[in-house]
Amino acid sequence: MEGSAGAPLRTRVCIIGSGPSAHTAAIYAARAELKPVLFEGWLANDIAAGGQLTTTTDVENFPGFPEGILGGELMDRCRAQSLRFGTSIISETVTAVDFSARPFRVASDSTTVLADAVVVATGAVARRLHFAGSDAYWNRGISACAVCDGAAPIFRNKPIAVIGGGDSAMEESNFLTKYGSHVYIIHRRNTFRASKIMQARALSNPKIQVFWDSEVVEAYGGEGGGPLAGVKVKNLVTGKISDLQVSGLFFAIGHEPATKFLGGQLELDADGYVATKPGSTHTSVKGVFAAGDVQDKKYRQAITAAGSGCMAALDAEHYLQEVGAQEGKAD
C-alpha cells in the first residue's frame, strides 16, 4: 500500500466489507501478494465490523468447529488471518466510489484508495421489525435466519412463529416444521404474496397455522429473565389480541443489500443486489467483482459467502494478470 500524508493510497486490490466473503477475498489476495486494502466500515448499516455474524450467537454450521463458535469470535479469527497475510485494514465506511476509469477510486470521509481491482462484499441486512420486546429477545429466541438458527436445541419440539408472506416466509416455515412442534405464520394481509406453489406447500402442511390480518405487538420471556416465551398478536380487523406461547420468532420479511454507496455505477437486479455473470463474481464493470450476500439472495450463508470471496479474489487475480499482459504487449 502506497501513499503519502493526505494523498490517495495506491493498491492492486481494494476490498469493501468485513464479513466472511470480504476476509476470504483478502486472505486469498494477500497470499497472492496483491497487498489488498480492506475497508471494514465503522458501524456500516448499523452493524459492527464483521457483518451479520456479529449479531449471531452460536454458529454451528461452519465447518471446522464441531462444538460451534460465537459469530463474533469467528469473524475475529477471520480478521486476524487477513492481517497475518498482510492485508491493510481501514476501519472506516466507504461513502463513494468511482468505477468510470482505472485506477478505481474508493473513498471514505477521510481516506481515498486507488485500486486496479475492487471487490464489493458489503453484504445484505435482514429486515427487522420493532415492537415491545423485539430488541430484548433478539438472539434470545428472535432471529432472521431459520436456516442458520432453526435447528438450535431451544427450538426443537417447541412452537415457533414466522412473520412474513413471501416465498422466503413459506420456505422457512416449512423448514422449521422439521424441528418445531408446529409453526404459526403471522401475516399482515389476508393473502400471501408468495408464489402459488410455495403457498400450497405451506398451507397443506398440517404443522402450519396461519394468522391472517395480524401483527406481533409484543414479545415476552419467561420468569427470571429467560429467553423468548411468547408473543402477543393483534388482529388488525377485529383488534383482538391473542397470546401465542412460542420459543422462537423468525422474521422472514426480506433483506436490504448494502449497495446505496455504489451510486448506480454497477448493474443491480430488480431487488437491488449486484448482478454478477453466471458462474463468476464479475460485475457489469470490468475489474470490479462482487462476493457474498450483496450478490446472493438465495443462499445467504457464511460458508457460501466465504466461497464466493475466494472466487472474487481468484477472479481479480486473473483479471490483473490479463491486464498486465495486455499492457506489456502495448509497451
UniProtKB/Swiss-Prot annotation:
Family annotation (Pfam families): Pyr_redox_2
Function, as annotated: Possesses thioredoxin-disulfide reductase activity.
Free-text remark on how the cofactor is bound: Binds 1 FAD per subunit.
Remaining remarks: The active site is a redox-active disulfide bond.
Keyword annotations: Disulfide bond, Electron transport, FAD, Flavoprotein, NADP, Oxidoreductase, Redox-active center, Transport
Subunit structure: Homodimer.
Source species: Oryza sativa subsp. japonica (Rice)
Site (Important for activity): residue numbering on this chain: 169, 188
Residues that coordinate or bind FAD: 18-21, 39-40, 47-52, 61, 94, 148, 293, 300-302
Gene: NTRB
PANTHER family with a match to the protein in the record: THIOREDOXIN REDUCTASE 1-RELATED-RELATED
BP term (GO), one: cell redox homeostasis
Family membership: Belongs to the class-II pyridine nucleotide-disulfide oxidoreductase family.
GO terms under cellular component: cytoplasm
Record-annotated disulphide pairs: 145-148
Cofactor(s) this protein cannot do without: FAD
Name the record gives this protein: Thioredoxin reductase NTRB
Record GO terms (molecular function): thioredoxin-disulfide reductase (NADPH) activity
This enzyme's EC code(s): 1.8.1.9
Catalytic activity line of the entry: [thioredoxin]-dithiol + NADP(+) = [thioredoxin]-disulfide + NADPH + H(+)
